[in-house]
Amino acid sequence: MPAAPRSTPASASASACAALRAALLDAPPVTVNSVPDLGRAVFVGSGDSLASGLIATEFGHRALSAGDVTWSQTLPAACDTLVGISHSGTSGATVRALRMARDAGLKTVAITSQASSPLADTADEVRLVPTLRVEEEVPCAGHVMLAQGVAAVCGVDTTPFNQALAQSLDGVRATVDAHVRDLPGSAPAAVSVLSLPELCSGADFWVLKLIEACGLAVRTVPLEESGHVDYFIGPQAHLTLQLMGPHGRSRFDRLAEALRTTGQTVCQVDTRHLTDPSAPDAAVLRDLATAVAGTWFAHGAALRWGRPPFRGGAVNMDARHIKLDS
């Protein structure tokens, strides 16, 4: 029997695009019947869920790693409401953080897809998000829905988001394919992801997906800090990804020029038109589309560089070390 044809970056993004579009159009929208009075809220999660929580910073709230609360045994200062985010509802640090907040008399909210879960059982209020029925080699579907749940809790009408995001995916794919084609033929030693706060959630998600897909050391860097610190990286091969939104273009360009003089490869990803900039809550939609782009970019880069996602199963994937054990 002939071997199955090897997937290419373009074929992988085409398959992922079709699958995610179908799942989005088939899923019910994320809705919130009533927006909770959050006061001064802190959103906590881990991994993809923390990236989802960063959406809340656009609305004046804070987002922290759930482990920073749980393992320091210290609740955030000036916090009225703790919002726990976990798709499964079983992430150990997130459940424990919510329990700490509940026991201290704070208001607690859970954002999850699982109504019968330890996280949901702990919260005063539960905001359920639908699960997208889609198979993914490098996942983003959970984040797409949890991030909508975060936005909805913050008062955004997310009812049209699935449709709007589905309509944007061809443009997202075209952007990704163009940038993957321009990547160096071999993997860098490490990667920096630069952004302004308007894309902090999407940038964080790019970091997560590049680590999962490519197995490289990847970090997120505030734009201005790249000129103060990243300027000294080298002489080893280094890839700098600039995620650009509506603001700061001239500063991105100047810093890109400076970083290139040190031998770095700089890739500028313009996210302004990944979604309709005139749509209601366009900034949140753009951040979601940026996260999807990062997922497909990471998978494409892994294929280009011959690096199997999740180290090809060479590490234990049962995730027991992050689940609730009591």
Where are these regions (language model features)?
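Glycine-rich phosphate-binding loops that contact phosphosugars or nucleotide phosphates
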Residues: 36-166, 170, 241-271
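Short, mixed-charge aromatic SLiMs
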Residues: 163-178, 226-235, 312-326
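Cofactor-pocket helix-loop regions in the catalytic cores of large enzyme subunits
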Residues: 26, 173-186
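C-terminal active-site/capping subdomain that shapes the small-molecule cofactor and substrate pocket
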Residues: 237-306
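Anionic-ligand anchoring segments at beta-strand to alpha-helix junctions in alpha/beta enzyme folds, i.e.
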Residues: 26, 30-80, 185-235
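Short alpha-helices
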Residues: 112-163, 197, 275-326
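Cofactor-/ligand-binding subdomain signature composed of acidic, glycine-rich
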Residues: 1-30, 144, 153-156
